[in-house]
Design a protein with these regions (language model features):
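A short, compositionally biased domain-edge/stem linker segment
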Residues: 35-52
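Extracytoplasmic
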Residues: 51-54, 61, 78-80, 85-87, ...
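Functional-site microenvironments in short loops/helix caps that host divalent-cation chemistry
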Residues: 23-24, 29, 34, 38, ...
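C-terminal motif of bacterial Sec signal peptides marking the signal peptidase cleavage site
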Residues: 13-15
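Bacterial signal peptide processing site
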Residues: 17-19
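Sec-dependent signal peptide recognition
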Residues: 2-8
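A short alpha-helix/helix-coil micro-patch that ends at or immediately precedes a cysteine
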Residues: 95, 99-110, 191-203
C-alpha cells in the first residue's frame, strides 16, 4: 500500500515567542525529528521575525487525561494517563490555502504530493519484499476523501479515501479541480515534511500530540468530543 508514504494534516501552528514565563519555551522550532521521520528535505529560507500573535489564542496550561478508555479508541491510545501541559499559543484557525500559497511563492517549495515518487525511498516504508508497482502507479498522487452513500466500517479507510493521481494542495479533488474561491479554506494534501517546512518559514512549530489533544478537548474533562458526549 502506498498510503503510509504520506501523512496528511491540517496545519495548525503553535507560537514560539513568549511574553510570559509561564508560557512554554521552545528552543528550536521545526527541527525534524530523528528516526521515524528522518529524511532529506528541501531547505527553505527561514524568515527572521517576531511571531505575530494576531490570529492566535493562548491555551492555559493544565493537567488532563490523555488517551482513550472506551471501545472506540485505537490500540495506540491506551493506556489513558495524566499529562501536564505548559501554556502555549496556538493558531485559532488552520493554515489557509492563501497562506500556504504565499509560502510556496516566496520559497519555491514543492510539496510531497507534487513530486515524482522515489521507489528506493518508498520501499523502505513498506514490508520487506514488496514488489515494485508499475511506473504508472508511481506518479505524483494523494488521497482524496470520497463520501460514502451509507454507513461503513471504520476499520477500512479505503472505503472513504481514494488514491488519485494529480491530487495536491492546488488541485484538492484531483485534475480539473482548483482552490479558486477557496483561498480561506484549510490547505490539504500536506505531508508532515511539508508542514515542517511551512512552520520553519513562518517561525512557528507544530503542536505536540499532547498539546493538540489538550486543545481539541475544549476544556472538557473526559468528554468524547470537544462539544461533549453523544450516544
Amino acid at each position: 500500500m502506498l498510503f503510509r508514504y504520506f501523512v496528511f494534516v491540517f496545519l495548525v501552528l503553535v507560537g514560539c515567542q513568549q511574553n510570559s514565563k509561564k508560557v512554554k519555551t521552545v528552543a528550536h522550532v521545526c527541527t525534524p525529528t530523528q528516526g521515524r521521520f528522518s529524511t532529506s528535505t528541501t531547505t527553505t529560507s527561514r524568515q527572521k521575525f517576531e511571531v505575530n500573535k494576531e490570529g492566535m489564542v493562548l491555551i492555559p496550561g493544565g493537567t488532563f487525561s490523555m488517551g482513550g478508555d472506551g471501545d472506540k479508541a485505537w490500540p495506540d491510545e491506551y493506556p489513558k494517563h495524566e499529562v501536564v501541559i505548559d501554556s502555549f499559543w496556538m493558531d485559532v484557525h488552520e493554515v489557509t490555502n492563501a497562506e500556504f500559497a504565499t509560502f510556496v511563492e516566496e520559497t519555491g517549495y514543492v510539496t510531497t504530493a507534487e513530486k515524482d515518487v522515489d521507489w528506493e525511498a518508498l520501499k523502505k516504508e513498506l514490508p520487506p519484499g514488496t514488489a515494485k508497482p508499475d511506473d504508472s502507479q508511481l506518479a505524483p498522487a494523494s488521497l482524496v476523501f470520497v463520501p460514502t452513500p451509507r454507513s461503513v466500517s471504520l476499520h477500512d479507510v479505503r472505503q472513504w479515501w481514494q488514491w488519485r493521481q494529480g491530487a495536491n494542495w492546488r488541485q484538492p479533488e484531483g485534475p480539473g479541480s482548483s482552490i479558486d474561491g477557496k483561498e480561506n479554506h484549510p490547505v490539504v494534501h500536506v505531508s508532515w515534511f511539508d508542514a515542517i517546512a511551512f512552520c520553519e518559514w513562518a517561525g512557528k512549530r507544530l503542536p505536540t500530540e499532547a498539546e493538540w489533544e489538550y486543545a481539541s478537548r475544549g476544556g472538557l474533562t473526559n468528554a468524547v468530543y470537544a462539544w461533549g458526549n453523544e450516544n
